[in-house]
Amino acid sequence: MNVEELPLLRQSERAAFKRCAWAWYMEYVRRIRPKVELGKEAADFGSLFHIALAEYYIPGLERGPHPADTWDKLSSDVVAAVKTTDYTNDETVAKWEDFHDLGLDLAEAYVELYRGDPHWLVLDAERRFDVIIPDVRYKPMVSEKGKRGYRPIVRVVGTFDLCVRDLNDNQVKMVDHKTAKDIITYHLTLDEQASTYIAVGTTALRHQGLIEPTERIVGMEYNFVRRGRIDDRPTDEDGQRLNKDGSVSKKQGSPNFLRYFVPRTSKERQRQVVRISEEARVMDDVRTGRMPLLKTPQRDCYFCKFFDLCELDESGGDTEYFISTTMQSIDPYADHREGAISSKKLHDA
């Protein structure tokens, strides 16, 4: 099989497949999505904040436009758009007007807290990658000249948020921006996104000449931004929030910002490559009908974009008519097609 004929695979797609193969099939094989998605404002908030940070962390030690300025422009455009759309919804308009102000406050506080991260030498931001993963069922082939070759199974594509050289220890690290309603870290040691990006990232960065052939990415720095109001109460020398009378408040609240580093060893990176290869094989078996297409019913199904379609499918209804009237065709790999312009940067490189 030629490289161009290999199936593409995104990290988010891996998670989607293991969450529910049927929903994965709808989005990544049928390539459909609802024409109108309710409740996706939080995800859009995160996407815009990512762009604001991508414009800020430009290669080198200098920094780009203030994230608040980029956020103001992008979110103002969204507010104007939701006010004029054919699907005008007062609740959506109000939410984005609130998000506009919230994002400005968070961007200002972010820069005030981290001061531009002078210890981060930015190697690249929002860099797309395309890495071939070998089929681990087959042993490497060795040519007469001693070169090792592999039988490919899938092309893993994606986008790194940020890659930096930490001048405090001269180590190369990935940085992943996370906007969320709550900051949760207990699962991150097993997070596959870190493992995947680091596993393929070292190879990608070496090929791009951004790191030396002997260097590797040592881990992922999760850069959390909690989507909540800034607590502007005064603090004591220990950083605890104070009441108006100067006493320490019993309600300290949750931090808006947190950095959490997860290291990855060479064995962990190698194991992730094996896992990607194994999952790609199972996906192909489902895609081609060699394995049954299964669903994973659970209480979170209500929040799935395909919930209504799934209910109709379970009841034996006319799903094809429903798809033709409520769904739109998409390309989940659009960002990674040849010549594509990145949707995650204002100015594509």
Show the residue positions of the predicted features.
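Active-site-adjacent bridging/hinge elements
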Residues: A21-V29, C163-D176, R275-R281
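Hydrophobic/aromatic-lined pockets within catalytic cores
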Residues: R30, A54-L61, V111, R115, ...
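A non-catalytic, helix-rich entry segment at domain boundaries
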Residues: I51-S143
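Non-catalytic protein-protein interaction segments used by genome-maintenance enzymes to assemble
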Residues: D124-R206
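Metal-dependent nuclease catalytic regions and adjoining charged, substrate-binding loops involved
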Residues: L8, Y186-H187, T202-A349
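Glycine- and acidic
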Residues: R33-V36, D176-I183, A349
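Extracellular structured ligand-interaction cores
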Residues: L48, V157-T159, I217
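Nuclease catalytic cores
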Residues: R14-A15, R19-P34, L38-L61, H100, ...
